[in-house]
Swiss-Prot record:
SS bond list: C97-C189
Gene Ontology CC terms, in alphabetical order: cell cortex; plasma membrane
Segments traversing the membrane: 26-49, 58-79, 101-120, 140-158, 197-219, 237-259, 273-292
Family, as annotated: Belongs to the G-protein coupled receptor 1 family.
Membrane topology value: Multi-pass membrane protein
Species assigned in the record: Homo sapiens
Name assigned to this protein: Olfactory receptor 2C1
Swiss-Prot/TrEMBL keywords: Cell membrane, Disulfide bond, G-protein coupled receptor, Glycoprotein, Membrane, Olfaction, Receptor, Sensory transduction, Transducer, Transmembrane, Transmembrane helix
InterPro entries to which the protein is assigned, alphabetical: GPCR_Rhodpsn, GPCR_Rhodpsn_7TM, Olfact_rcpt
Domain of life: Eukaryota
PANTHER family: OLFACTORY RECEPTOR
Length: 312
């Protein structure tokens, strides 16, 4: 950051989740348990998508990509959070903070784009079933995944670069438990209106455009589903789409609330828990949402466990 003094180069102090030290062990246990569930749930989906031949479809290719993103998304912030909750030190190095800023933005924006890609995949599956395999071929699937990754990287470079140009005010106390743009803007001296405008502009683009595409896709999907004569077919299509819509609502809702509110005006404790929601809670519940009513995943898991018992 321009104007950064020597002390700031030594690192930042993460203020954490709560101002009450007596609650830190409770938060540590709860967050550790949630993180372990995140690792288990998303790793299971990735393994099933790779090992089960019946799941070698575009839908599960993108779902395994989403699980990989969720694993990385949670891992970019939770281990540091656990370290700070466990010990007396609440610091993060300058390099660690900057790395976290870039990676968190990259993964978050990539997930925004990937959710749009998954909506497109569902649209083709429901509205163009006879051409689904031809349209969603492996080459296109990989291309869409790469576009999502590069789009997220572009967002990270733009927002992080603008944020790192801000001069610091002298103190190194980052409100919250991770280095992200709204928290870093609060550390700045002088006029931050340009940074806030860039933040709002980029976040609005990564929210309004994807959500518009998703809404249009699901309106078309709903029309197609209502034309299905089989009640079982309608139920299966609605269940698959409902899972994706719930994930979209959780991720976009919490991320938009955390990033589009003015950094200077948002409530401190509220902002911390919103950040916790999209950095840990959403990655934890995504596997549950996609698998609880998904018979294909349940069947694949039973077959995999059955093979494990036979080998044992």
């Amino acid at each position: 950051m321009d104007g950064v003094n020597d002390s700031s180069l030594q690192g930042f102090v993460l203020m954490g989740i709560s101002d009450h030290p007596q609650l830190e062990m409770i938060f540590f246990i709860a967050i550790l348990f949630s993180y372990l569930l995140t690792l288990l749930g998303n790793s299971t989906i990735i393994l099933l998508s790779r090992l089960e031949a019946r799941l070698h479809t575009p839908m599960y290719f993108f779902l395994s990509n989403l699980s990989s993103l969720d694993l990385a998304f949670a891992t970019s912030s939770v281990p540091q959070m656990l370290i700070n909750l466990w010990g007396p030190g609440k610091t993060i190095s300058y390099g660690g903070c900057i790395t976290q800023l870039y990676v968190f933005l990259w993964l978050g924006a990539t997930e925004c784009i990937l959710l749009v890609v998954m909506a497109f995949d569902r649209y083709v599956a429901v509205c163009r079933p006879l051409r689904y395999t031809a349209i969603m071929n492996p080459q296109l699937c990989w291309l869409l995944a790469v576009i999502a990754c590069l789009g997220g990287l572009g967002n990270s470079v733009i927002q992080s670069t603008f944020t790192l140009q801000l001069p610091l005010c002298g103190h190194r106390r980052v409100e919250g438990f991770l280095c992200e743009v709204p928290a870093m803007i609060k550390l700045a001296c002088g006029d931050t209106s340009l940074n806030q405008a860039v933040l709002n502009g980029v976040c609005t683009f990564f929210t309004a455009v994807p959500l518009s595409i998703i809404v249009i896709s699901y309106c078309l999907i709903a029309q197609a589903v209502l034309k299905i004569r089989s009640a079982e077919g309608r139920r299966k299509a609605f269940n698959t789409c409902l899972s994706h819509l719930l994930v979209v609502f959780l991720f976009y809702g919490s991320a938009s609330y955390g990033y589009l509110l003015p950094a200077k005006n948002s409530k401190q404790d509220q902002g911390k828990f919103i950040s916790l929601f999209y950095s840990l809670v959403t990655p934890m519940v995504n596997p549950l949402i996609y698998t609880l009513r998904n018979m294909e995943v349940k069947g694949a898991l039973r077959r995999l466990l059955g093979k494990g018992r036979e080998v044992g």
